[in-house]
Amino acid sequence: MNNLKWVAYFLKSRMNWIFWILFLNFLMLGISLIDYDFPIDSLFYIVSLNLSLTMIFLLLTYFKEVKLYKHFDKDKEIEEIKHKDLAETPFQRHTVDYLYRQISAHKEKVVEQQLQLNMHEQTITEFVHDIKTPVTAMKLLIDQEKNQERKQALLYEWSRINSMLDTQLYITRLESQRKDMYFDYVSLKRMVIDEIQLTRHISQVKGIGFDVDFKVDDYVYTDIKWCRMIIRQILSNALKYSENFNIEIGTELNDQHVSLYIKDYGRGISKKDMPRIFERGFTSTANRNETTSSGMGLYLVNSVKDQLGIHLQVTSTVGKGTTVRLIFPLQNEIVERMSEVTNLSF
């Protein structure tokens, strides 16, 4: 079937030749009908010989010219085609040389842009780490504040700044996340409690408590740093859009897969917004005056979940709240996924 495709392509590209040769042969036949002295047997012999030689010529040309395009069809690198001299005709060599020059130029640009991106990532990473020092010092100063009301307000704003810095750091590291992952068995409960501790100043100001219920063995095979980032972003959203309600957090076991659910009783997500919640920079269309949301939290979660093998489910009702469920993979599923990624990279 594949050979028929190449034959069809070849005949289509040589159709003008074929029509011209047929025209010349029919022209000779037409002349023979006018000139009665022209021996008809000789003419048929000439036409038959001409068509036979044309068929042989087309076959030889087909096998010679289609070879290069079959290499293209197999996705061979242009460097291999050029260095192995797989182009047969002068036009093919010229085409291969042109493609080689263009692809080489584009590769140089890609390398240059990648270096710039790496420098940009390094600059932002260094900036975030540098600014963390005065932010940490600020926390020590806030802890010395004796006015509890003022202290609580300052801790609330400090927590927001610290969270935004962490988010920016993770956004910067998105491109290199594969190199930055280390899988091991870790406790979901421990990760959740650590993240709750980080948000306690915000939850206290907003009158939000946490109902934590871990019913099953909560150890999962994942990368602790990136998994905590996902939990942090989901908790941040739950806190951001809730007030004076408890957030329910717990684990369940379905088909040997541990799942973590985080349920809030906040404003909820409308049906028209639901398909777009993972888009970069998207914020709710229901509250256009909302200035505290950057639209990056769920984008980050969506960008990382596949690398961790996590299946994400979001259900929501406007005015009643949102439930986010993280379904964790088994260890062998992670190993299989990493093997596939490694094979693709080669």
UniProtKB/Swiss-Prot annotation:
One example GO MF annotation: ATP binding
Transmembrane regions: 15-35, 43-63
Protein purpose: Member of the two-component regulatory system GraR/GraS involved in resistance against cationic antimicrobial peptides (CAMPs). Functions as a sensor protein kinase which phosphorylates GraR through the auxiliary protein GraX. In turn, GraR up-regulates many genes such as adhesins, exoproteins, transporters, toxins, and proteins involved in cell wall synthesis. Down-regulates the expression of many genes involved in RNA and amino acid synthesis or glycolysis.
GO cellular component, one term: plasma membrane
Protein name (record): Sensor protein kinase GraS
PROSITE patterns: HIS_KIN
Membrane association type: Multi-pass membrane protein
